[in-house]
Curated annotation (Swiss-Prot):
PROSITE patterns: ATPASE_ALPHA_BETA. Disulfide bonds: none annotated. GO terms for cellular component: chloroplast thylakoid membrane; mitochondrion; proton-transporting ATP synthase complex. It comes from Magnolia tripetala. This is ATP synthase subunit beta, chloroplastic. It catalyses: ATP + H2O + 4 H(+)(in) = ADP + phosphate + 5 H(+)(out). One of its GO terms (molecular function) is proton-transporting ATP synthase activity, rotational mechanism.
Length: 498
């Protein structure tokens, strides 16, 4: 889908200064603004309040029109704090929705919801901007081919493959490797697909956003020496921001991603952390606007809001946006309207397991809980499907036998079960892999493993050809040839010790 970005920088055009309104009422982040008859702004238009507060400090607040109230009044939601605003202040109708900078100049930079850089690195070197409100691509523009998005991460590509232009839910608590997995995906899409990434921090902790930025600089995903070489643009709307900003920051990130897809014709990864906070912010805004709440107190427009965001994330004939969304499940209740509405849009789920992380198996992706609609013989092929199913069956059998092993020991198992356990332990270790972005911490060089190599490796383990190799040979290696080489090295080392 082609877009026609404007070539003017963000700001208030002199033409629209003729359309001035005045603040009639302020209730927290909500403003009622009166305009002259016949000069009413449209829904989603950006309004700008400029002036000075009582102590002479400059004020510059951007709002978005949400309702037309009648009597020449509109109700708008502020995108920043409304401290210092007073009734009677002048409000400028910009005559257009919020527009944010787009293009290569956004890479390596941090933006707020308005597209303003907040990283103290000066202004963004682009005059190309794009409005955050746009319709989804028309059906005729969509790329309807079902194709796998290869990540180079064995456990993902084999057991829960991502769809090109699909949406993936990332489930995981604190400290199980979510950030490192996100950074590896950003790194791999840049190297293998020539693509870029956009990270939308929606209602996350400021500390987490800062940690992510620092880790990206450390791992080379953001190149401090040459910003243009960076692989990701960051857009943050933190927990302390007003609900209007948290509700729109996802759209700002998506708009930047759409430009890379439609104009640069690239494959783009869009990360949203956390999609639940997007719903939560919408719920707050809905209550502030006086709408009647729906199920569990959520906004009545929940499905519409979620759909308008998710439908824009798709593959077109030009390129693709593949979205990975962290999903917080309130009180672990999957039937809560927020996660339930999100699930309807997901093509795959990647579940991170604390148990695997405790064993030191990274990425700690749970092979049994992670799912994908792409894992079908007609899409991935019989060979891939059969291998994935056998890996899952072996892992499931090992899980069932663990209680017996804990109570009676391994010797009490049948010969067949002992063989299953040995292969399952090799599979578990072979699902781990060294990451490029973790090289600085582990000292092991990262590995990108192609899908064909991944399938071949697991087939060799399942066939019994590698039963004689020690299980530690399969830990943190790339393809199966590295595992056999590691086994030979271990054998040589043990002989030398003797």
């Amino acid at each position: 889908m082609r877009i026609n970005p404007t070539t003017s920088g963000p700001g208030v055009s002199t033409l629209e200064k003729k359309n001035l309104g005045r603040i009639a009422q302020i209730i927290g982040p909500v403003l009622d603004v009166a305009f002259p008859p016949g000069k009413m702004p449209n829904i989603y238009n950006a309004l700008v309040v400029k002036g000075r507060d009582t102590v002479g400090q400059p004020i510059n607040v951007t709002c978005e029109v949400q309702q037309l109230l009648g009597n020449n009044r509109v109700r708008a939601v502020a995108m920043s704090a409304t401290d210092g605003l007073m009734r009677g202040m002048e409000v400028i109708d910009t005559g257009a929705p919020l527009s944010v900078p787009v293009g290569g100049a956004t890479l390596g930079r941090i933006f707020n919801v308005l597209g303003e850089p907040v990283d103290n690195l000066g202004p963004v070197d682009t005059r190309t901007t794009s409005p955050i409100h746009r319709s989804a691509p028309a059906f005729i523009q969509l790329d309807t081919k079902l194709s796998i998005f290869e990540t180079g991460i064995k456990v993902v590509d084999l057991l829960a493959p991502y769809r090109r232009g699909g949406k993936i839910g990332l489930f995981g608590g604190a400290g199980v490797g979510k950030t490192v997995l996100i950074m590896e995906l950003i790194n791999n899409i840049a190297k293998a697909h020539g693509g870029v990434s956009v990270f939308g921090g929606v209602g996350e902790r400021t500390r987490e956003g800062n940690d992510l930025y620092m880790e990206m600089k450390e791992s080379g995903v953001i190149n401090e020496q040459n910003i243009a070489e960076s692989k990701v643009a960051l857009v943050y709307g933190q927990m302390n921001e007003p609900p209007g900003a948290r509700m729109r920051v996802g759209l700002t990130a998506l708009t930047m991603a759409e430009y890379f897809r439609d104009v640069n014709e690239q494959d783009v990864l869009l990360f949203i952390d956390n999609i639940f906070r997007f719903v939560q912010a919408g719920s707050e805004v809905s209550a502030l606007l006086g709408r009647m709440p729906s199920a569990v107190g959520y906004q009545p427009t929940l499905s519409t809001e979620m759909g308008s965001l998710q439908e824009r994330i798709t593959s077109t004939k030009e390129g693709s946006i593949t979205s990975i969304q962290a999903v917080y499940v309130p009180a672990d209740d999957l039937t809560d309207p927020a996660p339930a509405t999100t699930f309807a849009h997901l093509d795959a789920t990647t579940v991170l397991s604390r148990g695997l992380a405790a064993k030191g198996i990274y990425p700690a992706v749970d092979p049994l809980d992670s799912t994908s609609t792409m894992l079908q013989p007609r899409i991935v092929g019989e060979e891939h499907y059969e291998t994935a199913q056998r890996v899952k069956q072996t892992s499931q059998r090992y899980k069932e036998l663990q209680d017996i092993i804990a109570i009676l020991g391994l010797d009490e198992l049948s010969e067949e079960d002992r063989l299953t356990v040995a292969r399952a332990r090799k599979i578990e270790r072979f699902l781990s892999q060294p990451f490029f972005v973790a090289e600085v911490f582990t000292g092991s060089p990262g590995k990108y493993v192609g899908l064909a190599e991944t399938i071949r490796g697991f087939q060799l383990i399942l066939s019994g050809e590698l039963d004689g190799l020690p299980e530690q040979a399969f830990y943190l290696v790339g393809n199966i040839d590295e595992a056999t080489a590691k086994a030979m090295n271990l054998e040589v080392e043990s002989k030398l010790k003797k």
